């Protein structure tokens, strides 16, 4: 008999049944075997008539299953789940492409983003901070606070190097490019504001263990911006901006403190729920980032496409490029003996090169009568996001290698 042939047990006589005519027919017992399995390939699992036949190494194994049981291989189902989780978790890798796509869409069809008004910015940024908090721990933030030298480096990049570069390129805009004074003031205003929450998210995507340090840097610059930003604007632009201290502190709590605290608590006390939602955070974060980039551009599309738009884009590109490079080399010089110098360089670079341009835009619209002052902040939101997340794509590949 062939090794893989199915064996059919012959029915045995369990008794006889007498018909009224006197003839007798044998009464059959329930069959002890079923039809051959659907597949005879090695390692396959098949189901038939309430039994599972598995052919492997020339033998059959039988395991009874219920009629309602799923007939698919558990291994295949599990592999499908793993593949889906990988796809969801890897959504962050397409952020640069999504940012570029949202920029093009905002230029071609502004109504696709104009519905996402400024009132949604705080909840959107808060969600990104929540995603960072879910993937962090209290210990990470304690360790970050214990590095005052790194925090100081980020602060120097934010409020010394960046304002100097802003003043330089703002002056060039007026003296060399002959742009209106309002556009030069707008470039300087961008350099006076605190760090952007998107810098924290960019750091998280590149060096996750550095995200708490980046958050501490941005929180400190945001908290002190209530005093520093008006002072810098007075010296650079000649106009002292009355910043709402209460509103600024409230924004810090809503956008940074509360979402991160919620994420940390969820990670600490509800780990199962945290694990369940973690795979869905990357694609949602990508979507939110696209909205935060496309909306300011779409809302201010007329100013961006003005005759001065291209020159302003070139100047802001040079400003942000110089800021990223200056922050990178600042940390490289400051921490050249540190074991994690490369990670610190990337973190300080993000902190120096990415500003809270949305805050600058709000200040421009509120305190400057000339609408051209708001053009550089609107362009800056898009440029710094494109450049920052392009660096994420490059640096994250290097860290994995």
From Swiss-Prot:
Give the source's domain of life in one word: Eukaryota
Instruction: Give the transit peptide range.
Output: 1-46
Database matches in InterPro entries = BilAc:Na_symport/Acr3, Bilac:Na_transpt, Na+/solute_symporter_sf
Q: Which residues cross the membrane?
A: 93-113, 122-142, 159-179, 185-205, 215-235, 247-267, 273-293, 299-319, 372-392
Task: List the GO cellular component terms.
Answer: chloroplast envelope; membrane
Q: How does it sit in the membrane?
A: Multi-pass membrane protein
Instruction: Establish whether keyword Membrane is in the entry.
Output: yes
The main location is membrane
Cellular localization per UniProt: Membrane; Plastid, Chloroplast envelope
Keywords tagged on the record: Chloroplast, Membrane, Plastid, Transit peptide, Transmembrane, Transmembrane helix, Transport
Q: Identify the Pfam families for this entry.
A: SBF (PF01758)
Spell out the family assignment given in the record's similarity comment: Belongs to the bile acid:sodium symporter (BASS) (TC 2.A.28) family.
Q: What is known about what this protein does?
A: May function as sodium-coupled metabolite transporter across the chloroplast envelope.
Q: Which PANTHER family does this chain map to?
A: SODIUM-BILE ACID COTRANSPORTER, SODIUM_METABOLITE COTRANSPORTER BASS6, CHLOROPLASTIC-RELATED
Q: What is this protein called?
A: Probable sodium/metabolite cotransporter BASS5, chloroplastic
Natural source organism: Oryza sativa subsp. indica (Rice)
Q: What is the lineage of its organism?
A: Eukaryota, Viridiplantae, Streptophyta, Embryophyta, Tracheophyta
